[in-house]
């Protein structure tokens, strides 16, 4: 007897074919992209730094019953326990409460007395590995102190294909190398604090439109399947998979699969992306969890590589689950092999031990669902004990300092005609624009920050946190001006243009604040369904700038935004004497900005994306209307690797501000480029060969009678259990299609536990170890040629030489401090991966014979140093 309805959606989507991308127009009868299957799901083996944690995981999982293993894999249901996602427990073996997973990538969501950190895009603007690590460490400390086991971040999906994508701010940058480095450092910081980090959203999750059927239908779109992101193999490896390889190499404990389909197979049951790319090729040793309600099948997802279902129920609070009881049944009847569930549990516990949860763990001391001190143990159904659910533990420590430092270090000075830094002697200062002031409803007045009222320091969605306070620009500037004996006049109503004109005409300097917001698709703000409708400024921003500029010849524009905005109509106006992009700086917004405005911090930030003249400058538009009848909308990534600055370079289009651009209060010079091959007998590339060991199993399965609900157990309504109502498995499964034959839905090889061949590009966490061998050393001299001490960000780009390759691709960067007149030699190395392309035929990384060059400078378009690279293979 076998399952039917729980897996059919997965297996019809994962048909056998080569992954391809077709044109943009799709009809119901047109051939669509497919995702080739890859089975069986690789079993973890504790490679490298994972060995000890894996050994300990095997020891405890070997003692577990089947139901206990299943309990670790399945959430208990939405709002059933204190965290946004919480697994079942194994109290018999000391796991006395379920593993707690909690948003977000910038702080603890649904909590209090926590910090609100700068967004990922701000971290990218710092180009600083240490600051990325310290932010991760500080966040990890706060999550740990609240009793959270799994931090649901950071994000590298979306990468940033679309500048108007709703959640690009949660990630870092559209450049995979910049994202990969800062992604990895954030993960190291989180996990060094003893909390499991989650690399998300894996993969190709580049827009909000059509990510979920119910959400899209709520907006009036007639679709029956979620969007499919269609990508070719080369683009997948060289662009979107790149930062996830860095995450796996950094030891990330969890990966969250995304809502979208990839080549018409759902992200959480896509055997190509989960089994092959993530587990076999990248050697991922942790566990894959679903995004919330991104789980679409039972057996299909289990065989395709999913390890944890979140939040456990199929739809929020419906009491149904693809796993839980159904996963127990599927093992008992042989549909899912025992080794697959053993591997799920081992992967979860390996991550648990690797970060030290067994030493640091405390119960969650907050409730995601209420700020009341007392409440029901199981909030959704008002059942269980009436107990203390919020202990109001202050976890902020001294993290405001690192938040303020990152805020200043991420403030990009795009333009400066001598207006900055301010001297403090300005007598009359105008502060103009709603974005300077407070949200009249309070900093947390809009649930999940789902509005654009007052200054923008955080965008909207599940990737948010409650502010403990928010220092607005108006407050910080007023404090600064008053302390220097000046006068400050603020108008923070964007409709009060005549009043703004009056203030601007009397001010020696006018600071204008404008913004543009976006977020997750379940919230619609002013017709923006997560994704932005356009790249214009919000809340009458252009009119505010026009008004002030026409009345003040010293206008400084400050932009808080989730990404690029259109500035072409005013950026070169001579009365606009400076432009600042401050991103989403978090709770210390005003303080960090004032540090830069008044010169206490010399700006060193570089824009992590390109500022184009029009939306069309960025290439293909975001898919905002269904294009495949009522089936899955098809988003074809026909641009390949050419996004952001790579696209501008290909088109020979000059942007307003190029990727990597950012001014300082001093100047820097570049000289003395040196390139040296690092020849050694061990530098030859060695494709991985051999095979795995057989799939191990741990403990005994038992019989159905072993997993019946105990007599006298008071079951919680809609709570997801791993237990059975009956020894009749069909009755326990409640599956109307129970009885299908294996041949109808089980992919070939999916249950094969015999030794499997290793992939050439695999062999260790992050991929083939020889990919990371250094082949070339590059050095350059950086000189502070000005009169102010400051940081510079040297950037190294490589021309890979092929006729269809980008002009340059970023490969290395740093942030170095230089006193006036000081010189430093910056030295870095290029490894094999930095110089290679993905060969779709060989299914491996290859350094082509095309001549290659190295370029060093201060941005993607300011590269004064260049030299040929020695031929290395």
UniProtKB/Swiss-Prot annotation:
UniProt GO cellular component terms: extracellular region
Main EC class the enzyme belongs to: hydrolase
Gene3D superfamilies, per the entry: Glycoside hydrolase family 3 C-terminal domain, Glycoside hydrolase, family 3, N-terminal domain, Immunoglobulins
Keyword entries, A-Z: Carbohydrate metabolism, Cellulose degradation, Glycoprotein, Glycosidase, Hydrolase, Polysaccharide degradation, Secreted, Signal
Chain positions carrying an annotated carbohydrate: 71, 222, 263, 326, 333, 365, 453, 534, 553, 575, 679, 725
Pathway linked to the protein: Glycan metabolism; cellulose degradation
Catalytic activity entry: Hydrolysis of terminal, non-reducing beta-D-glucosyl residues with release of beta-D-glucose
SUPFAM superfamilies, per database record: (Trans)glycosidases (SSF51445), Beta-D-glucan exohydrolase, C-terminal domain (SSF52279)
Role, per record: Beta-glucosidases are one of a number of cellulolytic enzymes involved in the degradation of cellulosic biomass. Catalyzes the last step releasing glucose from the inhibitory cellobiose.
Entry similarity comment: Belongs to the glycosyl hydrolase 3 family.
Protein name: Probable beta-glucosidase A
Organism of origin: Neosartorya fischeri (strain ATCC 1020 / DSM 3700 / CBS 544.65 / FGSC A1164 / JCM 1740 / NRRL 181 / WB 181) (Aspergillus fischerianus)
């Amino acid at each position: 007897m076998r399952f039917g309805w729980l897996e059919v959606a997965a297996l019809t989507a994962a048909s056998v074919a080569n992954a391809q991308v077709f044109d943009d127009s799709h009809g119901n009868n047109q051939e669509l992209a497919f995702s080739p299957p890859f089975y069986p799901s690789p079993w973890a083996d504790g490679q490298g730094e994972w060995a000890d944690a894996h050994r300990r995981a095997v020891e405890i999982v070997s003692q577990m019953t089947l139901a206990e293993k299943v309990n670790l894999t399945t959430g208990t249901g939405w709002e059933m326990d204190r965290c946004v996602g919480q697994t079942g427990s194994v109290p018999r073996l000391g796991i006395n409460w379920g593993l707690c997973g909690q948003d977000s990538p910038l702080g603890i969501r649904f909590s209090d007395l926590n910090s609100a950190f700068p967004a990922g895009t701000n971290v990218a603007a710092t180009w600083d590995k240490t600051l990325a690590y310290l932010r991760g460490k500080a966040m990890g400390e706060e999550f740990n102190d609240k009793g959270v086991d799994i931090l649901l971040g950071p994000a590298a999906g979306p990468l940033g294909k679309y500048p108007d994508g709703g959640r690009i701010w949660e990630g870092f940058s559209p450049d995979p190398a910049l994202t990969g480095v800062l992604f990895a450092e954030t993960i190291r910081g989180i996990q060094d604090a003893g909390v499991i980090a989650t690399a998300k959203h894996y993969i190709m999750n580049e827009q909000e439109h059509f990510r979920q059927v119910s959400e899209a239908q709520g907006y009036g779109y007639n679709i029956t399947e979620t969007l499919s992101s269609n990508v070719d193999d080369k683009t997948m490896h060289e662009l979107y998979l790149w930062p996830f390889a860095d995450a796996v190499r950094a030891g990330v404990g969890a990966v969250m699969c995304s809502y979208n389909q990839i080549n018409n197979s759902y992200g959480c049951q896509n055997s190509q992306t989960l089994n092959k790319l993530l587990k076999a090729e990248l050697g991922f040793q942790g566990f894959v969890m679903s995004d919330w309600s991104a789980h679409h099948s039972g057996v299909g997802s289990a065989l395709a590589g999913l390890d944890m279902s979140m939040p456990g129920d199929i739809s929020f609070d419906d009491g149904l689950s693809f796993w839980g009881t159904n996963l127990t049944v599927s093992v008992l009847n042989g549909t899912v092999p025992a080794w697959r569930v053993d591997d799920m549990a081992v992967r979860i516990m390996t991550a648990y031990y690797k970060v030290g949860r067994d030493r640091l763990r405390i119960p969650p001391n907050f409730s995601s669902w209420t700020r009341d001190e007392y409440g029901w143990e199981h909030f959704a159904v008002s059942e269980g004990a009436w107990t203390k659910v919020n202990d109001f533990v202050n976890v902020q420590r001294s993290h405001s300092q690192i938040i303020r430092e990152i805020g200043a270090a991420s403030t990009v000075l795009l333009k400066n005609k001598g207006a900055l830094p301010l001297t403090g002697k300005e007598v009359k200062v105008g502060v103009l624009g709603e974005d300077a002031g407070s949200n009249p409803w309070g900093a947390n007045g809009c649930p999940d920050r789902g509005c654009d009222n007052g200054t923008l320091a955080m965008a909207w969605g599940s990737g948010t946190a409650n502010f403990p306070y928010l220092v607005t620009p108006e407050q910080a500037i007023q404090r600064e001006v008053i302390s220097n004996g000046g006068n400050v006049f603020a108008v923070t109503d964007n409709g009060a243009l005549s009043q703004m004109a009056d203030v601007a005409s009397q001010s020696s300097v006018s600071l204008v604040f404008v913004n543009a917001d976006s977020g997750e698709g379940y919230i619609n703000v002013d017709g923006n369904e997560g994704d932005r409708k356009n790249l214009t400024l919000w809340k009458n921003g252009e009119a505010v700038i026009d008004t002030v500029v026409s009345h003040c010849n010293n206008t400084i524009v400050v932009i808080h935004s989730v990404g690029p905005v259109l500035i072409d109509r005013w950026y070169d106006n001579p009365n606009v004497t400076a432009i600042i992009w401050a991103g989403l700086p978090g709770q210390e917004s005003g303080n960090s900005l004032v540090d830069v405005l008044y010169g206490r911090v010399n700006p060193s930030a570089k824009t992590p994306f390109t500022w184009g003249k029009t939306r069309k400058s960025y290439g293909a538009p975001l898919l905002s209307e269904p294009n495949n009848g009522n089936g899955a909308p098809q988003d074809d990534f026909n641009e390949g690797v050419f996004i952001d600055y790579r696209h501008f370079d290909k088109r020979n289009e000059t942007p307003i501000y190029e990727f990597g651009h950012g001014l300082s209060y001093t100047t820097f010079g570049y000289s003395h480029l040196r390139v040296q091959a690092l020849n050694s007998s061990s530098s030859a590339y060695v494709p991985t060969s051999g095979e795995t060991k057989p799939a191990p199993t741990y403990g005994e399965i038992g019989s159905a009678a072993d997993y019946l609900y105990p007599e006298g157990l008071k079951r919680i309504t809609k709570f997801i259990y791993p237990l059975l109502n009956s020894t009749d498995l069909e009755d326990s499964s409640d599956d109307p299609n129970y009885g299908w034959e294996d041949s109808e839905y089980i992919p070939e090889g999916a249950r094969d536990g015999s030794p499997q061949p290793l992939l050439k590009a695999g062999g260790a966490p992050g991929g083939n170890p020889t990919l990371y061998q250094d082949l070339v050393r590059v050095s350059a001299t950086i000189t502070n040629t000005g009169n102010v001490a400051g940081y510079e960000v040297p950037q190294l780009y490589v021309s890979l030489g092929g006729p269809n390759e980008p002009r340059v691709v970023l490969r290395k960067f740093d942030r170095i401090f230089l006193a006036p007149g000081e010189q430093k030699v910056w030295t870095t190395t290029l490894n094999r991966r930095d110089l290679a392309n993905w060969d779709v035929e060989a299914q491996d990384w290859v350094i082509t014979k095309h001549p290659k060059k190295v370029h060093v400078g201060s941005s993607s378009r300011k590269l004064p140093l260049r030299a040929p690279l020695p031929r290395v293979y």
